[in-house]
Amino acid sequence: MSFLNFAFSPVFFSIMACYFIVWRNKRNEFVCNRLLSIIIISFLICFIYPWLNYKIEVKYYIFEQFYLFCFLSSLVAVVINLIVYFILYRRCI
């Protein structure tokens, strides 16, 4: 399995979740709270989504790079979310 096939849906869901949870939630007004929320949401979605996908499809074979791909996809999601956050944050100032 290639990294692009593995990481597209978790990264996409992570970006959408960060947009809806962080940007639509008015109680996270501090930058530090929003950054922590972005990082936590990205890591959780990118680790839990592929794992649940394999458990639901009852595939008992997890390939060697599964956890590496989870970690790399979460890093990609965090970087994309932080770039979007800082672009929108500078535009709002």
From Swiss-Prot:
It comes from the Bacteria. It is found in: Cell inner membrane. The chain crosses the membrane at residues 3-23, 36-56, 68-88. Its main location: membrane. The keyword Membrane applies. Probably able to protect the producing cell against microcin N (microcin 24). This is Microcin N immunity protein. It comes from Escherichia coli.
